[in-house]
Curated annotation (Swiss-Prot):
Keywords assigned by UniProt, alphabetized: Glycoprotein, Membrane, Signal, Transmembrane, Transmembrane helix
Bilayer-spanning residue ranges: 183-203
Lineage, highest ranks first: Eukaryota, Metazoa, Chordata, Craniata, Vertebrata
Signal sequence extent: 1-20
Protein name: Fibronectin type III domain-containing protein 10
Compartments where located: Membrane
Topology relative to the membrane: Single-pass type I membrane protein
Domain Fibronectin type-III: 74-166
Length: 226
């Protein structure tokens, strides 16, 4: 049985379902008793070992939900970046318990690609208890690269050789221009309004056809006699 044209039009103009939030896999959500994260933003130059000690609380209950957030998570990696609409990026990572016991800190390096070379944007030293970091004020339409490297514990006097540091994991992303997002939202709203108007017009035409024109067509014509 074929569906009526009006039902097909309603199905075509129906708004798309809301985008579901990106699920949080086990290990990404911080535990309720997770400690505060100590970190230092390291300056560029010869005094790179300085920096003011700061603290941040873990990002509990965070969900990356479109269109206000875009998730960049390379397959098989323990590092992911959530690019928010306010031009900030939440970087999250996870470690196995055995590997976490061998880490004394994390080194985060940020860079962005220009026309001919890459430019550093931020270097952060994070404590071993840190599992996320918020990078504020990224530029639109610029390819960023964030690399996180676990730093092993310092070898004691009895150790034969220092432990080799693990390789850094990196994630790349580009922040979408906020103006383009507003244009997309506006076009979606206008398209939805046009669909609603078409549905109303179709309903009016169907009502006029069923209730006004059919009785007039069914009424027999009156013939005039001389």
């Amino acid at each position: 049985m074929r569906a009526p044209p009006l039902l097909l039009l309603l199905a075509a103009c129906a708004p798309p379902p809301c985008a579901a939030a990106a699920p949080t896999p086990p290990g990404w959500e911080p535990t309720p008793d997770a400690p505060w994260c100590p970190y230092k933003v390291l300056p560029e130059g010869p005094e790179a070992g300085g920096g003011r000690l700061c603290f941040r609380s873990p990002a509990r209950g965070f969900r990356c939900q479109a269109p206000g957030c875009v998730l960049h998570a390379p397959a098989g990696r323990s590092l992911r970046a959530s690019v928010l609409r306010n031009r900030s990026v939440l970087l999250q990572w996870r470690l196995a318990p055995a590997a976490a016991r061998r880490v004394r800190a994390f080194a985060l390096n940020c860079s962005w690609r220009g026309a001919y070379t890459r430019f550093p944007c931020e270097r952060v030293l994070l404590g071993a208890s840190c599992r996320d970091y918020l990078l504020p004020d990224v530029h639109d339409s610029v390819l960023y690269r964030l690399c996180l490297q676990p730093l092993p514990l310092r070898a004691g006097p009895a150790a034969a050789a220092p432990e080799t540091p693990e390789p850094a994991e990196c994630v790349e992303f580009t922040a979408e221009p906020a103006g383009m997002q507003d244009i997309v939202v506006a076009m979606t709203a206008v398209g939805g309004s046009i669909c609603v108007m078409l549905v109303v017009i179709c309903l009016l035409v169907a009502y006029i056809t069923e209730n006004l024109m059919r009785p007039a067509l069914a009424r027999p014509g009156l013939r005039r006699h001389p």
